[in-house]
Curated annotation (Swiss-Prot):
Keywords noted in UniProt: Cell wall biogenesis/degradation, Cytoplasm, NAD
Known function: Catalyzes the conversion of UDP-D-glucuronate to a mixture of UDP-D-apiose and UDP-D-xylose. D-Apiose (3-C-hydroxymethyl-d-erythrose) is the only plant cell wall monosaccharide with a branched carbon skeleton and found in rhamnogalacturonan II (RG-II), apiogalacturonan, and several apioglycosides.
GO biological process: cell wall organization
Compartments where located: Cytoplasm
Subunit structure: Homodimer.
UniProt-recorded name of the protein: UDP-D-apiose/UDP-D-xylose synthase
Stated family: Belongs to the NAD(P)-dependent epimerase/dehydratase family.
């Protein structure tokens, strides 16, 4: 075959890492490959590298275009393995055959943390234990996806609201190697997720210290983009409550007011999925710089309150859809009303970017409005007609 007809990834072995070394093709066991992050990472690896991916998940809807069947140019590059890591003996075999395991599997929807705390703890800690064990025992590298929730509350949140130190960065900017992890009381089961994620981080770190496990831990700060979460009643349960962007998207698609929990005063940062995937790509191909590291991956420039996010999404969706906003586009609801008993929250989550910038030279690029336009355009094209049909059927049967 001539080079002109080769797929883009065919020459990937000639690429160099950040230290000028050739990048050898890897075999990657990607657990949770069928989800939001996994689907984008699979696309990136198939388009730009020669790596081979064992895509492990219980569903493949978001990567069906890659695996069912694989396009001719990806033959032998990606394979789907339908298994549940809770109880499938095939998992160890896949990890043994791989050079690198990436674990994306998790329950990571805030509405589940205090309504399904046992499932949340089991999914994020107990079910992750065999993955760590198999990697450690077989001397395989692990990239484990954690969460920015492990930081919990900021130090500044314990100061009076008018205290001048609340505005000082050292009281709210979150640093991987310095910031304490501060959670609420046990009765606030919202912290079940953060505690489980922190404990598996500590176990991975201990495996590295005592048994030489090569690992990288990723702490995502609100990664946003197409294929995130689900729209209730369309490609997810009708009673399901996805994360904030999908919740607001669902409201906009149905022309319902956006629900602001406790007034929407919490502050968050948001990063575009394609920017974040570039950071993960750098971790994969620069093990000497990534091993033993914990990386914040977010965009501190895209900080807004949840209320401001709702306002921006309302404006952007009106432009995308051509539909004017509602006269009353937002309503306030209490956290108890929206999430149930046991909910608690962190006031602010701003990532420090020093370590990832120093080790990998990575910085996010996409402004918040641009990523919202891309995401809401996708949501509108993907879901609007299905929601119209659903609403019309509900109206006819009532």
């Amino acid at each position: 075959m001539s080079s002109s007809s080769s797929p883009p990834a065919a020459s990937a072995a000639a690429r160099l890492d950040l230290d000028g070394n050739p990048i050898a093709p890897l075999t990657i066991c990607m657990i949770g490959a069928g989800g939001f992050i996994g689907s984008h990472l699979c696309e990136k690896l198939m388009a730009e590298t020669a790596h081979v991916v064992y895509a492990v998940d219980v569903y493949c809807d978001k990567i069906r275009h890659l695996v069912d069947p694989a396009p001719p140019h990806l033959h032998g590059r990606i394979s789907f393995h339908r298994l549940n890591i809770k109880n499938d003996s095939r998992l160890e075999g896949l990890i043994k055959m791989a050079d690198l395991t990436i674990n994306l599997a998790a329950i990571c929807t805030p509405a589940d943390y205090n309504t399904r705390p046992l499932d949340t703890i089991y999914s994020n800690f107990i079910d992750a234990l065999p993955v760590v064990k198999y990697c450690s025992e077989n001397n395989k590298r692990l990239i484990h996806f954690s969460t920015c929730e492990v930081y919990g509350k900021t130090i500044g949140s314990f100061l009076p609201t008018d205290h001048p130190l609340r505005k000082e960065p050292e009281f709210y900017v979150l640093k991987e190697d310095e910031s304490p992890c501060i959670f609420g009381p046990i009765v606030k089961q919202r912290w079940s997720y953060a505690c489980a994620k922190q404990l598996i981080e500590r176990l991975i770190f201990a495996e590295g210290a005592e048994n030489g496990l090569e690992f990288t831990i990723v702490r995502p700060f609100n990664w946003i983009g197409p294929r995130m979460d689900f729209i209730p009643g369309v490609d997810g349960p009708s009673e399901g409550v996805p994360r904030v962007l999908a919740c607001f998207s669902n409201n906009l698609l149905r022309r319902e007011p956006l629900k602001l929990v406790d007034g929407g005063q919490s502050q968050r940062t948001f990063v575009y999925i394609k920017d974040a995937i570039e950071a993960v790509h750098l971790m994969i191909e620069n093990p000497a710089r990534a091993n033993g590291q914990i990386f914040n991956v977010g965009n501190p420039n895209n900080e807004v309150t949840v209320r401001q996010l709702a306002e921006m999404m309302t404006e952007v969706y009106a432009n995308v859809s051509g539909e004017p906003p509602l006269d009353e586009p937002m309503i306030d609801v209490s956290s108890k009303q929206f999430y149930g008993e046991g909910y608690d929250d962190s006031d602010k989550r701003i990532p420090d970017m020093t370590i990832i910038n120093k080790q990998l030279g990575w910085n996010p690029k996409t402004p918040l409005k641009d990523l919202l336009e891309t995401t809401l355009t996708y949501q509108h094209k993907t879901y609007k007609e299905a929601i119209k049909r659903q609403m019309s059927q509900a109206s006819a049967s009532s």
